[in-house]
From Swiss-Prot:
This is Large ribosomal subunit protein bL25. Disulfide bonds: none annotated. Pfam families: Ribosomal_L25p (PF01386), Ribosomal_TL5_C (PF14693). PANTHER family: RIBOSOMAL PROTEIN L25/GLN-TRNA SYNTHETASE, ANTI-CODON-BINDING DOMAIN-CONTAINING PROTEIN, RIBOSOMAL PROTEIN L25_GLN-TRNA SYNTHETASE, ANTI-CODON-BINDING DOMAIN-CONTAINING PROTEIN.
């Protein structure tokens, strides 16, 4: 996803409020744990993109931020929402550097849920863990991981170890944990 961002000068509450009122989202780009730049993201463009994403996919989406004539590859590390309107009010981006490891959550998609044996027998499929925490290089980031649940019967489970994890990803979450279960209704 490409975003054109502009620089902003200050962290004063009154100016941040003004940015939000004029259709912007205050944001910060971090690099190596330190603040690299204070920026403004177009609220309309970002909200439209956010609404088109599948649930959980934001954590593994790589953004190309066009900033002062250069392009910065980054992940959203934190997002803040307004309490009542649920509008995005602040973003934190983490710059991706080729040779540096990054920690992130990659969403888990259950595939073949319609053909699941346990569901056909009247069970209920429940996804216990929706994302796997991993460490990897930016080039190894994948949008999601798949877990096939077709052969899952009643009262059976699938663990994180049943997921085919690409070579460059190193899981942080223990793989012995249950990811999906089919229970009797």
């Amino acid at each position: 996803m490409e975003l054109v961002v502009t620089s902003r000068e200050t962290d004063k509450k009154s100016l941040l409020k003004k940015i939000r009122q004029t259709g912007g989202i205050p944001a910060v780009i971090y690099s190596g744990g330190k603040s690299l730049a204070n920026i403004v993201v177009d609220a309309h463009v970002f909200s439209k993109f956010l609404s088109s994403l599948e649930s959980g996919a934001l954590s593994s989406t790589i953004f190309s931020l066009s900033y002062e004539g250069r392009t910065i590859k980054a992940l959203v590390k934190d997002i803040q929402y307004h309490v009542t309107s649920y509008r995005v009010i602040h973003l934190d981006f983490e710059e991706l550097i080729e040779d540096r490891d990054v920690k992130l959550k990659i969403p888990i998609r259950c595939i073949n849920a319609v053909d699941c044996v346990g569901v056909k027998l009247g069970g209920s499929l429940r996804q216990v863990i929706r994302a796997l925490r991993v460490v990897c290089k930016p080039k190894d980031i994948v949008p999601y991981l798949e877990l096939d649940v077709r052969s899952l019967g009643l009262s059976q489970t699938r663990k994180l170890s049943d997921i085919q994890i690409p070579a460059g990803l190193r899981p942080i979450t223990p793989l012995k944990e249950v990811a999906v279960t089919v229970s009797r209704r």
